[in-house]
């Protein structure tokens, strides 16, 4: 069974002929050139052939086979855009795919204490990734995964060392 990787999210229809707007999480738009899979929530991954793709006002626009009008495109709102993990390009030595580090233990760089586990991620914009970290007592911390706040990702030990912005953890963890 293929393992899929989310590379984007359909946000809304565009125009009348069935195009959809996609917030892309991928560095390369070429990942959405021929075939993609769409998933609603935790439902099945459904394959679609990409008839055309183009960039418009900072977002990717896709025209998918079988999606021929705005009504059909509207039904795809908030669907995840995925590709098989095997189709991802090779990474540099210091790079990782977010899906490969889900489940890693997150520790504070300052004192080495465990904050929790990386359980999910989102990318409100292509330049801004947010990690969801679940603490041992079940609290959810939304963490800006900017380079200046991520000290190290150690794939061998499955740990991520972070340096949170001042006051961030207090917002989520106070009132315990």
Curated annotation (Swiss-Prot):
Any Gene Ontology CC annotation: ribosome
GO terms classed as biological process: ribosomal small subunit biogenesis; rRNA processing
Principal subcellular localization: cytoplasm
Domain of life of the organism encoding this protein: Bacteria
Annotated compartments: Cytoplasm
Family that this chain belongs to: Belongs to the RimM family.
Recorded domain comment: The PRC barrel domain binds ribosomal protein uS19.
Purpose of the protein: An accessory protein needed during the final step in the assembly of 30S ribosomal subunit, possibly for assembly of the head region. Essential for efficient processing of 16S rRNA. May be needed both before and after RbfA during the maturation of 16S rRNA. It has affinity for free ribosomal 30S subunits but not for 70S ribosomes.
Assembly and binders: Binds ribosomal protein uS19.
Name by which UniProt lists this protein: Ribosome maturation factor RimM
Organism: Oleidesulfovibrio alaskensis (strain ATCC BAA-1058 / DSM 17464 / G20) (Desulfovibrio alaskensis)
Chain's gene name: rimM
């Amino acid at each position: 069974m293929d393992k899929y990787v989310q590379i984007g999210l359909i946000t809304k229809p565009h125009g009348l002929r069935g195009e959809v707007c996609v917030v892309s999480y991928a560095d390369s738009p070429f990942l959405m050139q021929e075939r993609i899979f769409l998933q609603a929530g935790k439902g099945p991954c459904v394959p679609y052939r990409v008839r055309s793709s183009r960039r418009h006002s900072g977002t990717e626009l896709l025209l998918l086979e079988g999606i021929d009008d705005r009504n059909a495109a509207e039904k795809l709102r908030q669907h995840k855009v995925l590709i098989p993990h095997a189709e991802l390009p090779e990474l540099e030595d210091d790079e990782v795919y977010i899906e490969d580090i889900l489940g890693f233990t997150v520790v504070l760089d300052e004192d080495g204490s465990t904050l929790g586990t990386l359980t999910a991620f989102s990318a409100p914009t292509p330049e801004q990734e947010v990690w969801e970290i679940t603490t041992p007592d079940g609290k959810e911390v939304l963490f800006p995964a900017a380079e200046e706040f991520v000290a190290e990702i150690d794939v061998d030990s499955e740990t991520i060392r972070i340096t949170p912005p001042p006051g961030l953890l207090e917002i989520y963890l106070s009132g315990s």
